[in-house]
Curated annotation (Swiss-Prot):
Gene this chain is encoded by: rnhB
Entry EC no(s): 3.1.26.4
Catalytic activity line of the entry: Endonucleolytic cleavage to 5'-phosphomonoester
Start and end residues of each RNase H type-2 domain: 19-214
Taxonomy of the source species: Bacteria, Fusobacteriati, Fusobacteriota, Fusobacteriia, Fusobacteriales
Protein name: Ribonuclease HII
Organism of this sequence: Fusobacterium nucleatum subsp. nucleatum (strain ATCC 25586 / DSM 15643 / BCRC 10681 / CIP 101130 / JCM 8532 / KCTC 2640 / LMG 13131 / VPI 4355)
Positions contributing to a divalent metal cation binding: D25, E26, D121
Annotated InterPro entries: RNase_HII, RNase_HII/HIII, RNase_HII/HIII_dom, RNaseH-like_sf, RNaseH_sf
Compartments reported by the entry: Cytoplasm
Cofactor descriptive note: Manganese or magnesium. Binds 1 divalent metal ion per monomer in the absence of substrate. May bind a second metal ion after substrate binding.
């Protein structure tokens, strides 16, 4: 990879401003069902293939799946998961932080937290993490490492929701991935919530809102 080609990639240039960067992002903060998944990544080698990486929300599912394999090849990757039970117990923000800490803990090339700067998507630092952190609002559109973490987290979670769809075919998890679509809410009303799959606190709020609409 020629330096002039690297200079054309603003996402990579952002990461170059810091020494030893880790990108962290999550997927699944807003759904009514399923876990929250966080990913932490460290770039091993920059290749031209990585120029296709962008914010996971702007990519098609097929494109994310393709980039997932490219990222796994070029980054050291770890994933952390917080369960529905943990989300209900801790609240979604703290469950988010827990998933992120788990991902960071499992990064094989992270030997000393103090040698790295964690670039985390959003405006908050990860609670109870001792290493240096830099929260970046809309970081998945600014940093290559955060964008890569975003894709890993999203693809991993989508796959988990498809697995749940095989177990509970009446809920169409493979389509809405646990989000509060009309189809999903109607399935919950008709068939009930699934213990350990649906988030009780989230459901209470959404069903109360739906009830208000009918008054």
């Amino acid at each position: 990879m020629l330096m002039e080609e690297i200079m054309d990639n603003p996402l990579y240039l952002y990461d170059l401003e810091y020494k030893n960067v880790i990108g962290v992002d999550e997927a699944g903060r807003g759904p009514l069902a399923g876990p929250v998944v966080a990913a932490a990544v460290i770039l091993k080698e920059y290749t031209e293939e990585l120029d296709e990486i962008n914010d996971s929300k702007k990519l098609t599912e097929k494109k994310r799946e393709k980039l997932y394999d490219i990222i796994m090849k070029n980054f050291d990757v770890a994933v952390g998961i917080s369960t529905v039970e943990e989300i209900d117990k801790l609240n979604i923000l703290n469950a988010d932080f827990l998933a992120m800490r788990r991902a960071l803990k499992d990064l094989k090339s992270l030997k000393n937290e103090k040698e790295y700067t964690v670039l985390v998507d959003g405006n908050l630092k990860i609670k109870e993490y001792i290493g240096k952190q830099l929260p970046i609002v809309k970081g998945d559109a600014k940093s290559l490492s955060i964008a890569a973490a975003s894709i890993i987290a999203k693809v991993t979670r989508d796959r988990l929701m498809k697995d749940l769809a095989n177990i509970y075919p009446d809920y169409s998890f493979e389509k809405h991935k646990g989000y509060g679509t009309k189809t999903h809410i109607e399935a919950i009303k008709d068939k009930g919530a699934i213990e350990g799959v649906h988030r009780k606190v989230f459901l209470r709020k959404i069903l109360e809102t739906e009830e208000e609409k009918t008054k």
